[in-house]
Each structure stands twice: as structure tokens, then as C-alpha cells.
Amino acid sequence: MFLHFGVNTFTDREWGDGKESPDVFHPTDLDCRQWVRQARAAGFGMMILTAKHHDGFCLWPSRYTDHSVRSSKWQNGQGDVVRQFVDACREGQMPAAFYLSPWDRHEPSYGDSPRYNQHFVNQLTELLTTYGPFAEVWFDGACGEGPNGKRQEYDWPSYYGTIRKLEPTALIAICGPDVRWVGNESGVARPGESSVRDAGAHQGSEARGQVWYPAECDVSIRPGWFYHASQDDKVKSVEHLLDIYFKSVGRNSVLLLNVPPNRAGQISKFDVQRLTEFRAALDEIFKTDLCAGRPAHGSNIRGNDPRFAAANASARATSAPVTA
């Protein structure tokens, strides 16, 4: 489950400009445990919080910026959404992950590549060492102008190295070497989507061998990524969500469904209802295991060796979650 939450939730925008007052961030009844309960009930296998979006506002009291919960009046500047989020995830036995946007429309050093890259590594280190362990770090590739009108050259190898050093088991997703973006925000993979890709091909270099590089399909349950009250009646239908499911999970990809918390700091009742209906529909569709007790056959056997016959396969279906 993706959770887009931040100053945009309160300014009714999708992309903030970094000039918003930290005081606009003021959830009246933040309940991260409610997030986890709803995610577990719907069958999600991971939760990813937007710790910092393009506006640069941090949902933790970062010591590297003045644009964070520390500078807001919410909980007298003592609030920490990331802390409440990871604590709720651990209490509910839900893997926690975070989204961290390299684009920062507030940070003055953005566009001064070496200086900003160190700033970004500092914040990345702060999150990993203060709140870990994390299951995944999700990098957005957006690279617009900063407050000085300059663009930034991201030091991806440095970012990856920091994660590998501090959180070696965490996946690095989207702008990363472990999980790739499917290429759209509609939650739809290509027919025949393969997890085996040419090594280096995504970087524009000559392919040398092949690697395991699965696709992730991100999409929001609403038209927008952040919560907007005007979209309460525009939550995707069960039929639409099922179509997305079969065109993502059914095409060998991970489905990352965004469910944005509202201004109170909770998942909206409208979204909860749709998640409940979606889960019920999936349970009904898959209540009968069509493979149980069926014989296995293979038209091609490795080296024509009967030891590799399909009937000897040890793989089995599991009830593991297939969405994040």
C-alpha cells in the first residue's frame, strides 16, 4: 500500500512548491494503526509512506531542514509521523518502507550538485539509522527545478551505496537496481511482462547478460495521489480495481495501490469501504484452488531427463500477499 501524505493533503494540491508554511500540516486525529489495520484486512504485504515529497516537507523532525514537522505547530513541533508509522507497522507485523523524493523544491542547495547530494545522503542516513529496519526504499525520478531555478544531477551510486551499507536487505525500487517502474501510473503491465531483463539495458548501455528485475505497477485508488475531499465520490470501482489487478498481478508484476490518508490523518471511510469490497471480490474469485490435486505436465523437459519432469516440481501455490 502506497500512502501519499504531507502538506499537499492540506493545501489540496498534488505537487507543492516548497514555499508552503509548515503550519498547514495539522492532522487532527492521526492514527497510523488504522492505516495498518486496513492494509492487513485488505491483504497488502507492505506499506510505503511518502516521508518527503517534491515540496521538501519532511514527515520526520529532520535536523537538516527547516521544512518539516519540527517547524509546524502540530503537536507543538514534537510530532513525528514516520515514527508513528514504523511503530504501527511493527506492532501490526507489517513491513514498512518509505518514499523519498530526490527533487526538493524547498532546499536551497538543490541544483548545487555535490552539496545537495550530500544533503540528500544525510537525510537518507537519518531515516535509515533512526527508524529502520525498512523493507524498501522507493525513489521517484522527478527532477525539476529547485528554488534557485537550477536542476540537480542526482548521485544515484552514492544513494544506493548508503542503503546497501546501512540497510543491506532493503529493496531499492523504481529509480533503483532491484525493482523497476512499469512505465505508467495506471497500474497496467504489458502482456507477457518478464522479470528477466538485459543487464544495463535500462541505463542505455550495452546489455551484458541478464538480471532479475521485476516490474511494479503503481496506481491510486483515487484520481489524485494525495487526498482531496472533492474526490470522495470518485474512488475507483471494484470492477476497475479488479481489471487493474489482473493487468498487473496477472501479468507477473507487483501492484502498488495508493490509498492516501485524509486531513484527519486516517484512511477515508470511502476508501475503506472500497478496499473491503475489493478484498471480498478477490476472495470470492480465488476461493477454489483450481490447481489442487491436478496432475502436472510439461511439453519440454530439461535435457529430456525424467528427473526434471513437471510431475516432480516442488513449487506450490501460497497464500502470500501479492500486493504492496
Annotate each predicted stretch with a short phrase:
Residues 2-314, 318-321:
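Mature catalytic domains of secreted/periplasmic carbohydrate-active enzymes
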